[in-house]
A protein has these predicted regions:
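A cross-kingdom feature that marks ATP-driven nucleic-acid transaction machinery
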Residues: 301-473
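Phosphate-binding site recognition
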Residues: 1-337
Length: 473
């Protein structure tokens, strides 16, 4: 995989390399997000022991590690006579530190820890002995997010408090797609983001000269597609998981629109409490997130909770691939599925939540808001001459660090222009959020522009802002 712009992260590592102290950095993030490429770019022109662990016995891992140490140190004997223990490896690294600055990067460290549980204690001991040596730069890296947050960076981890820095590498945000899809329109880039998300490995697979439909067929739907089995590879990284089929059933339910815990439990045939535990595990893995109205004062106690798949590609796969795998055996099947189901459903699939999330991210950056998200709840409205409680939702709400609503927005991914009535409804709901406070600004986002009346009113209202898709990219 090619190295893509990780300027901030690379700069942070380089600044630590120049610091007058030992460094111990934890770098983790989901599979395919670019951790290895970042480490290798950082390691350029540095004396480095880089080791990418794989599942295997301790002796196999030490043999591979000895080869990496031999390449970095010039001690060819290590390759012929591998080290026999991790204690011996850390002793050898200690000797190498006497020769000058040394970067030691242990990638996919979760495989080492599972095979040799005592390695964490050995690292702690090594760090205690050498934390005063400015020649040492140690990186632990890996793809098992739940393992790293539990065993490496969490409060209960044996290594907690010893690291000097940590980086949780995330997928690229939507605006970064311009580097992967040169020449694509903002509309098509949003569609691509809805399918492939911001994971560099997935985006690298795309052919910018081909259409989105061609890329989806070739890489996701075809039997030999590069990403056809990607979710299964993703789950294979987590050896502590049991009942993969149940987790897949949960993700499939969420992708189909069942976002409340009781709806998910009913779909997978588990109790609410058992489903809650499974959802907790998926959240630990960074695959699912808990969503609540952005204005909720105490998110941990609210009952207004929904669950969302956090990765657009996983959402697409569980919506359009997993339920139909039994009929996708040939390339001709993939073409038929693409034209018969995927493309006719794509605009609806893009509209929510992906287009709304793109608008939320833009507004967060534009306003410097503390938090931006959805809002939903009960609103009193006059229906048939009487006041009734009506359930309403807002696509975008931004709040500041005081919890005050700064802005409210509406998003429309449709072929027609956004009508003036959208502003009227948005204004009424925004007033409901701030009945006694200052009126928030209104932001209206539209794929296809705005009608003449709405445009005219917005021109004369400094608190009303119209945003087209071209401004988002």
């Amino acid at each position: 995989m090619a190295f893509h712009d990780r300027t901030d992260e690379l700069q942070a590592l380089e600044e630590r390399w120049r610091s007058p102290r030992a460094e111990y950095v934890v770098l983790y993030g989901r599979r395919r997000v670019g951790k290895t490429e970042l480490i290798l770019r950082f390691a350029e022109h540095k004396r480095c022991v880089y080791y990418e662990a794989t599942p295997g016995t301790e002796s196999d891992q030490l043999e591979d590690l000895s080869r990496a140490l031999a390449e970095a140190s010039g001690r060819e004997l290590l390759a012929a006579q591998p080290l026999t223990s991790w204690r011996a490896f850390f002793a050898a690294v200690g000797e190498e530190l006497r020769r000058g600055p040394l970067l030691v990067a242990l990638d996919e460290f979760q495989f080492v820890a599972r095979e040799t549980p005592a390695v964490g204690s050995l690292i702690n001991r090594f760090w205690r002995e050498h934390r005063g040596d400015p020649n040492l730069f140690l990186i632990l890296s890996g793809s098992d997010v739940s393992f790293f947050e539990r065993e490496i960076v969490g409060y209960t981890a044996t290594t907690y408090g010893r690291r000097t820095g940590s980086l949780h590498l995330q997928p690229f945000p939507f605006p970064e797609l311009s580097g992967f899809l040169p020449g694509w329109s903002a509309e098509d880039a949003i569609r691509a983001y809805a399918v492939f998300g911001g994971v560099p490995y997935y985006l690298d697979a795309l052919d910018p000269a081909a259409t989105l439909a061609e890329n989806v067929e070739r890489h996701v739907l075809a039997p030999d597609g590069l990403l056809r089995q990607e979710p299964r590879f993703l789950f294979a990284q987590h050896s502590d998981l049991r009942e993969e089929s149940v987790y897949f059933s949960i993700l499939r339910a969420i992708a189909a629109g069942r976002t409340r815990r009781n709806e998910i439990a009913s779909r997978v045939g588990r109790s609410d409490s058992a489903t809650g535990q499974l959802l907790d595990k998926l959240m630990e893995m960074g695959l699912v997130r808990r969503v609540h109205p952005v204005t909720v004062a105490n998110p941990d106690r609210t009952k207004l909770v929904r669950f969302a798949i956090d990765d657009p590609f996983l959402r697409f796969w569980f919506a359009f691939v997993h339920p139909y795998e039994s009929r996708l055996h040939r390339r001709a099947d993939a073409q038929e599925h693409l034209q018969g189901l995927v493309m006719p459903s794509l605009e609806h699939f893009v509209s929510r939540p992906v287009f709304e999330q793109v608008c939320q991210s833009w507004l967060r950056d534009h306003l410097g808001a503390a938090s931006v998200g959805w809002w939903w709840g009960s609103v009193k409205e006059r229906v048939d001459g009487s006041l009734r409680n009506v359930q309403r939702e807002l696509d975008v709400v931004a709040i500041d660090h005081e919890g005050i609503v700064m802005a409210a927005g509406s998003c429309r991914w449709t072929a027609g222009r956004m009508a003036h009535g959208e502003k009227t409804l948005l204004n009424r709901l925004a007033h409901h959020l701030t009945p006694d406070g200052p009126e928030p600004d209104l932001y209206l986002f539209s794929r296809s522009g705005f009608d003449a009346r709405l445009t005219r009113e917005a021109d004369g209202d400094p608190k009303c802002h119209l945003v087209g898709v071209g401004e988002l990219f």
